[in-house]
Amino acid sequence: MTINLILLSLLAYVIGSIPSGLWIGKIFYKKDIREFGSGNLGATNSFRVLGIKAGSIVTVMDILKGTVATLLPFFFQLNVDHHFWLLTGAFAIIGHSFPLFAGFRGGKAVATSAGVILAYAPLLFVAALVVFLVTLKLSKYVSLSSMIGALAALIISLFMGDWILIVLVACIALFVIWRHRANITRIRNGEEPKIKWM
């Protein structure tokens, strides 16, 4: 069982490493999104550089990376406690952030982390998504909405009584905020781009 779990965790990392934005940009738009906008491989920069259609596809793909990776123990009928689903999910987040296929320079882990939560705690995902969308509607800042959504997920998880989930969501929230530190500076300086499509 231990070997199988290790293998699934490695597979989850590989799944997380799929650079959706990079590949879609290069294949369909002949653009390397690392050379435009924020230079980030995530969904937000895909929206900014490639447009709403491509950005939406990248977002869905990045969410699915987290969801599929989290459910790997279920798909392979591995007889482990469901908390181990969070382990494979965590490896997908690591893969997305430090992708094997993109020089270990990845995204900010928001969408893939959301996919992990979707697979493990769907109601928590919905609640955090609502907070994200409301914040996005009011502020027009994707970065700010992502951070507030992550913090909301942490606060809500505290009432769920699942301490392993709480620890993971706390790590996700801290990591998301850390990855957005440049965005925080730009928001303070009034230099952070706002979305125009919502």
From Swiss-Prot:
Enzyme Commission code(s) on record: 2.3.1.275
Catalytic activity: an acyl phosphate + sn-glycerol 3-phosphate = a 1-acyl-sn-glycero-3-phosphate + phosphate
InterPro entries in UniProt: G3P_acylTferase_PlsY (IPR003811)
Domain of life: Bacteria
Coiled-coil annotated residue ranges, if any: none
Pathway(s) it belongs to: Lipid metabolism; phospholipid metabolism
Localization (cell): Cell membrane
Keywords from the named record: Cell membrane, Lipid biosynthesis, Lipid metabolism, Membrane, Phospholipid biosynthesis, Phospholipid metabolism, Transferase, Transmembrane, Transmembrane helix
Entry membrane topology: Multi-pass membrane protein
Function in brief: Catalyzes the transfer of an acyl group from acyl-phosphate (acyl-PO(4)) to glycerol-3-phosphate (G3P) to form lysophosphatidic acid (LPA). This enzyme utilizes acyl-phosphate as fatty acyl donor, but not acyl-CoA or acyl-ACP.
Subunit structure: Probably interacts with PlsX.
Family as reported in the entry's similarity comment: Belongs to the PlsY family.
Name by which UniProt lists this protein: Glycerol-3-phosphate acyltransferase
Organism: Listeria monocytogenes serovar 1/2a (strain ATCC BAA-679 / EGD-e)
